[in-house]
Amino acid sequence: MLIPLGLLGVLGLGLAGWSAYVGRKAEEMVPAEGKFAEVPGAHLHYVELNPEAEGPAIVMVHGLMGQLRNFSHSLAGLLAADHRVILIDRPGWGHSQLVGPRPGIAAQAGMIAVLIEQLGLEKPLLVGHSMGGAVSLALALDRPQLVRGLALIAPLTQIVETVPAPFKGLLAPLALRPLLAWTVAVPVGVRTGPATAAAIFAPDPVPADFALAGGGALAVRPKSYMAGSFEIRAAPAEMAGLVARYGEIKVPVAILYGREDAVLDPQLNGEKTAAEIPGATLELIDGGHMLPVTHPEATEAWLRRLLTPPAAR
């Protein structure tokens, strides 16, 4: 019995060492490129584009297993021509570091609210993609005075009973997360990464440069597995609390969905939510879940319409 246990120990140490190596290499390939802000509970990494722009500021919040390059890959530069654009790595994601307990949706919203205040942003448009949409909704409910409105792209807005297929591997019990994160999660992620990305982007193709220019490589780290597993497990209860308060939302809310989204249901997370939030609008376009990457021009045009006063349209 001692020999097999010893072999398991050696194997585990080997996997942990290799996982750490892969994580370091990913961070070398996709390095931090912005600034860090100290907020309660986290060191937030963010990138600021065109800080002197005269147009309304835009704050962009990425989704599950993502990071700020999901926006800078294709979309943010288009908007930065005449807007101050701030891209944020959510707490625990990308290059943002936690300095306290892992935060849920509402706590992340609170941290981003502090960053908005620290940067002196005057009612920015808050753009949330996927899980970032849920965080944006929480911020609008708790700190509505900070934002001019929400622009939600393929957002998580409802209780999702069945975890989307690309993320089922994140369904780890709390007690097993560290073990899985530092042993099997990284090698499995490296092996299945292309297929997982294809499923998330479907029916749109995955850009050849997404791993680097889009930050995709950072998803294959122990840190990312831990964060993703936590959010997948915590989401149903947290979304129940948000959904119950949708009638309280006072800021303008616009939702954009791809008709062929293979990750989140546009009818549930788009149509149902637009009917529940006072004055909310929904627009559907051709495409899948990763619209900021795969359909940047259409997404930009939609965002610019939201930023243009009705009388000027």
What are these regions (language model features)?
Residues 249, 255-257:
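Short beta-strand/loop motif that positions the catalytic acidic residue
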Residues 280-313:
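Catalytic active-site module of serine/aspartate enzymes centered on a nucleophile-bearing elbow/loop
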Residues 25-26, 164-165, 185-248:
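Conserved alpha/beta-hydrolase catalytic His-Asp/Glu region
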Residues 48-95:
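Conserved HGGG/HGGXW glycine-rich cap/lid loop of the alpha/beta-hydrolase fold
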Residues 1-56, 81-83, 122, 308-313:
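Alpha/beta-hydrolase fold catalytic core
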Residues 47-50, 87-127, 163, 301:
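Active-site loop/oxyanion-hole signature of alpha/beta-hydrolase fold enzymes
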Residues 234-236, 260-264, 290:
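Acidic catalytic loop of the alpha/beta-hydrolase fold
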Residues 122-163:
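Conserved hydrolase catalytic core segment
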